[in-house]
Curated annotation (Swiss-Prot):
UniProt cross-references to CDD domains, sorted A to Z: GDC-P
Principal localisation: mitochondrion
Species, as recorded: Saccharomyces cerevisiae (strain ATCC 204508 / S288c) (Baker's yeast)
InterPro entries linked to this entry: GcvP, GDC-P_C, GDC-P_N, GDC_P, PyrdxlP-dep_Trfase, PyrdxlP-dep_Trfase_major, PyrdxlP-dep_Trfase_small
A GO BP entry: one-carbon metabolic process
Reaction(s) the record says it catalyses: N(6)-[(R)-lipoyl]-L-lysyl-[glycine-cleavage complex H protein] + glycine + H(+) = N(6)-[(R)-S(8)-aminomethyldihydrolipoyl]-L-lysyl-[glycine-cleavage complex H protein] + CO2
This enzyme's EC code(s): 1.4.4.2
UniProt subcellular location: Mitochondrion
Anything else known: Present with 12000 molecules/cell in log phase SD medium.
Protein name: Glycine dehydrogenase (decarboxylating), mitochondrial
Domain of life: Eukaryota
Cofactor: pyridoxal 5'-phosphate
């Protein structure tokens, strides 16, 4: 009871210290919660864990398919053993020792779910009821960057719905990622072929953010001297909005011109202060700029070394001349229509391609071709020194997670259809669009076709006094069709691969066109205008010609996934990544048509299911974080950071404090923090950490005081990036508040807080959440992600809006920042995953995700501390526990020739993905097991690490066996075909089967250790053509 009273008083103190930032109503509400803590603190005892874990067999009404025992790895008896190993008898006592008393709040959660959570079948029934409230059977011809697609079932079942694909991590360990790397290389090849540019990345977040990256790349190439950027009037509106958001922090002036008025456009582009121009091709109204106009735009920009960027459509580019033909420097867009569902706006893989001289400036990850230790061709992520985890605030972009899973879907769609199949789809779309266009241009039709060129989109000025509202109403009520209202008397529509002749017949009826049969009998599939038609052969690599039968495609996908290590194989103990279970029940709804077939610009009354789900999820996340408001629009962690900082800046500007532009960031922070701050127009000032890993509060106070007039914010990860619960966090927050700054608490490590404490309880102003970490969205091999930002009440008016549709949850006003993503709710299709996870764990179960995550981490640390040095948690430290992750220090062995990367590679021979390598401290490994791993798996990993320590000792002692580390990993080919085993100093058995469990279940690295230097020095990031392969063979 005394402990609870102290906690309540500390909560009150926190609120009083933040009165300038929290409304009086919020303070009263918080006080009532603090009083509640005296009698209703969250129960995290071992007895409660047994109740949560075990089904209730006494009550016949209670379901047996409860979720917590499926999600949480250790059984109650395992928990007892683990606690005993560490000297504890109860989970509650363990947590009270681990989390500082001023941090441990244990405020009861108020989730909109049964206290013990839904069981699995209840969850599916509940979600189906919600999903059926969406109008998913309506035929959407809205377009504007989102289209109906047909996802081949062989790809849906064997890739999108396969845990071997969606539970893997970003392929930073290439020896166990060759399958995904090949699929991503296919994606890059598709993009490079269709755009005509030599270098493409492995995806970005969406078309709008890709456009923002193009603008900033153009700006940076000008050395930030050219402050004007030109955009075509006929750009998608959501892209314009994102561009305005990205431009503001750099004082870039966006100039909108009508590029179809080529003389006027060229005059504007000749201004030497213009860094670049972005054109939509085909345009949002469906029109296509003539070749000579595109060339004039390019020439005008190149005359003063500025860049032409083109936002394009990959499906259209199977027929259209590639933008590179006209001199484009950058081509970007969305690959969504290559089989990826609309999903109410995402996730979809954006693409980004550049000319050769920009290959080291391109944002995002690039897959390149290299070779391994044995000289075998292999794939890896290339040019990593560009990325934010290395360059920090000097990085080309803050992009981290992208859309790898969806890029793999899109590339597989292209592999399955091949070049002829893709062009047949495109010709059919064009033919059906032409039927409708010619009917509207007929003399008997009262309406006027605005665009005289097209691929799939038509814009129509309505006649006979008909309003857009009337026509849209008629289309929906009589034919179950959605169209797009451009203005009160103009509509547009876009056809896609799902469109049939019956659909076109209904559209003719919508426009009151008689004698439809005479138009429907026409075939325009071979009538694509010659002036626009590409003449080169596309997708020449053999991979796009070999797998067109379902059997061949099934085997190809299986062959790729068998080369990759995922959670289906073993634990992925990556620190700061939280590779927890992505349960089957959570994943099932994402391919339901009720969720996947929804266009993001459908009227709000047609998406009531999404509205109900989003509203409830937002309330739950606010309860978990202790905040008042939320935006689900950011679609990656880096995007969430950027959005939170932009919201802070908007709030400060509204108070007349535009001059506040300094962001304090600890030196231990993840590289996305300083990169995001720089993108938000903030000056990064580093704050030191002490030798024990904690934030240097004296340095923080000095820096805050030094920059008191310019201080905008501090970005702090909690628990810290070192995996520590620092007791001084509230003091740090008070320091920043006292000098007028806002506090951004990075939610990357939220998996250690849920139900125990929260950013809001600690006094922060804003945080982002990684839904792909704490809330069970899969990593997908590098995306998708979700990163809502949660804020205190004073920041709610500044949350991002959307320019095309109203936000169904009511956010958006005069103070709102412009969109940060193309879609109003970002990657909306994956939100049911987090929704289901929270609802199934329930108020009582969810805190145990954090409790067991920390139990697993500390158990592993206890087992390993006698064999390795543990950074910051040792006999020299006041901290005796880590949070949910810990750092193994290998730096002492470097002088003897052992690097952390040697241990990382050797773990592959034991069947494990390496922990986080060289971050946050070079020469270390950061380990995070998550709550989903059982005791058997934890012990297996610890046994592997202990065995590797013996190998380290051998190398340090100069014994030949120690070379096993330097040669790791060992592929099956190496073991069978290499002829130098007599001189290696160790046996094949020692290389492949160092521990007994590997004889029962062995995952083989596909290739030997890669040559990173060779890969960067000889950059190849597309599949070679058939001719190139033939030449190599000769």
């Amino acid at each position: 009871m005394l402990r609870t009273r102290v906690t309540a008083l500390l909560c009150r103190a926190t609120v009083r210290s933040s009165t300038n930032y929290v409304s009086l109503a919020r303070t009263r509400s918080f006080h009532s919660q603090s009083i509640l803590l005296k009698t209703a603190a969250t129960d995290i005892t071992s007895t409660q864990y047994s109740r949560i874990f075990n089904p209730d067999l006494k009550n016949i009404d209670r379901p047996l398919d409860t979720f917590a025992r499926r999600h949480l790895g250790p059984s109650p008896s395992d928990v007892k053993k683990m606690l005993k190993t560490m000297g504890y008898s109860d989970l509650n006592a363990f947590i009270e020792e681990l989390v500082p008393p001023n941090i441990l709040k244990r405020r009861p959660l108020k989730l909109e779910a049964p206290s013990k959570g839904f069981c699995e079948q209840e969850m599916l029934q509940h979600l189906e009821k919600i999903a059926n409230k969406n109008h998913y059977k309506v035929k959407n011809f809205i377009g504007k960057g989102y289209y109906g697609t047909i996802l081949p079932p062989v790809i849906q079942r064997n890739l999108l719905e396969s845990p071997e694909w969606y539970t893997s991590y970003t392929p930073y360990q290439p020896e166990i990622s060759q399958g995904r790397l090949e699929a991503l290389l296919n994606f890059q090849t598709v993009v490079s072929d269709l755009t005509g540019l030599p270098v493409a990345n492995a995806s970005l977040l969406d078309e709008g953010t890709a456009a923002g990256e193009a603008m900033l790349l153009s700006f940076n190439i000008s050395r930030k001297k050219k402050l004007k950027y030109v955009i075509d009037k006929k750009l998608h509106q959501q892209t314009k909005s994102v561009l305005h958001t990205r431009a503001k922090p750099f004082n870039i002036e966006i100039i909108e011109v009508d590029c179809s008025d080529i003389k006027k456009a060229v005059d504007v582009l000749k201004n030497p202060d213009v860094s670049g121009c972005l054109v939509q091709y085909p345009a949002t109204d469906g029109s296509i700029l003539p070749p000579d106009s595109m060339k004039q735009l390019s020439d005008a920009l190149h005359s003063h070394k500025s860049l032409l960027s083109v936002a394009s459509d990959l499906m259209a580019l199977t027929l259209l001349k590639p933008p590179a033909h006209y001199g484009a420097d950058i081509v970007l867009g969305s690959s969504q229509r290559f089989g990826v569902p609309m999903g109410y706006g995402g996730p979809h893989a954006a693409f980004f391609a550049v000319i050769d001289k920009l290959n080291r400036k391109i944002p995002g990850r690039i897959v390149g071709i290299s070779k391994d230790r044995l000289g075998k061709t292999a794939l890896r992520l290339a040019l990593q020194t560009r990325e934010q985890h290395i360059k920090r605030d000097k990085a080309t972009s803050n992009i981290c997670t992208a859309q790898a899973l969806l890029a793999n879907v899109a590339s597989s769609y292209c592999v399955y259809h091949g070049p002829k199949g893709l062009q047949n789809i495109s010709r059919r779309i064009f033919s059906l669009t032409s039927i409708l266009a010619n009917a509207i241009e007929n003399d008997s039709c009262p309406h006027e076709l605005i665009n005289k060129t097209w691929f799939d989109t038509l814009t129509i000025k309505l006649g006979n006094g008909i309003s857009s509202e009337q026509l849209l109403d008629k289309a929906l009520k009589e034919f179950n069709i959605n169209l797009f209202a451009v203005d009160t008397t103009t509509i547009s529509l876009a056809l896609d691969e799902t469109t049939t002749k019956a659909d076109v017949e209904n559209l003719l009826k919508v426009f009151d066109i008689e004698n439809s049969s005479q138009f429907l009998s026409e075939d325009y599939s071979n009538s694509f205008p010659r002036e626009f038609q590409r003449t080169d052969e596309i997708l020449r690599n053999e991979v796009f010609h070999m797998h067109h039968s379902e059997t061949a495609m099934l085997r190809y996908l299986h062959r790729l996934q068998s080369r990759d290590l995922s959670l289906a194989n073993s634990m992925i103990p990556l620190g700061s990544c939280t590779m927890k279970l992505n349960s089957t029940v959570e994943m099932m709804p994402i391919t339901w048509p009720q969720f996947s077939n929804i266009h993001p610009f459908q009227p709000s009354n047609q998406v009531q299911g999404y509205k109900e789900l989003i509203t409830s999820l937002e309330k739950d996340l606010c309860s978990i974080t202790g905040f008042d408001g939320i935006s689900l629009q950011p679609n990656s962690g880096a995007q969430g950071e950027y959005t939170g900082l932009r919201v802070i800046r908007s709030y400060l500007e509204s108070k007349g404090e535009n001059h506040r532009n300094v962001c304090l960031i600890p030196v231990s922070a993840h590289g996305t923090n300083p990169a995001s701050a720089a993108m938000a127009g903030l000056k990064v000032v580093p704050v030191n950490c002490l030798q024990d890993g904690s934030l240097d509060l004296v340095d923080l106070k000095n820096k805050a005081e030094q920059h008191s007039k310019e201080l905008a914010a501090v970005m702090i990860t909690y628990p810290s990036t070192y995996g520590l619960f620092e007791p001084g966090i509230q003091h740090a927050i008070d320091i920043v508040h006292s000098f007028g700054g806002q506090v951004y608490l990075d939610g990357a490590n939220m998996n250690a807080q849920v139900g125990l404490t929260s950013p809001g309880d600690l006094g922060a102003d804003v945080c982002h959440l990684n839904l792909h970490k704490t809330f069970s969205i899969p990593h997908g091999g590098g995306g998708p992600a979700g990163a809502p930002i949660c804020v205190k009440s004073h920041l709610i008016p500044h949350l991002p809006k959307h320019d095309v549709v109203d936000m169904i949850t009511g956010i958006g006003g005069s103070k709102s920042i412009d969109s940060v993503s193309s879609a109003p709710y970002g990657n909306a299709l994956v939100l049911p995953i987090s929704y289901a996870y929270i609802k199934m764990m329930g108020n009582e179960g969810l805190p145990f995700s954090s409790v067991i995550a920390m139990l697993n981490s500390n158990y592993m640390m206890t087992r390993l501390k006698d064999h390795y040095k543990i950074l910051f948690v040792n006999e020299m430290s006041t901290l005796k526990h880590c949070a949910h992750e810990f750092i193994v220090d290998l730096r002492e062995y470097k002088a003897k020739g052992v690097e952390a990367i040697d241990v990382a590679k050797r773990l592959q021979d034991y069947g494990f993905h390496a922990p986080t390598l060289a971050f946050p401290v070079p020469g270390t490994l950061m380990i995070e097991p998550t709550e989903s791993e059982n005791l058997e798996e934890l012990d297996r990993f610890c046994d592997a690490m202990i065995s590797i320590k013996e190998e380290i000792n051998a190398l340090v002692a100069g014994q030949p066996k120690g070379q096993i580390l330097k040669n790791a990993p060992h592929s099956l080919e190496d073991l069978i075909t290499s002829s130098n085993w007599d001189t290696r100093g160790y046996t094949r058995e020692e290389a492949a089967y160092p521990l007994p469990f590997l004889r029962y279940n062995k995952f083989w690295p596909t290739v030997a250790r890669l040559d990173d230097t060779y890969g960067d020095m000889n950059l190849i990031c597309t599949c070679p053509s058939v001719e190139e392969i033939a030449n190599e063979t000769e």
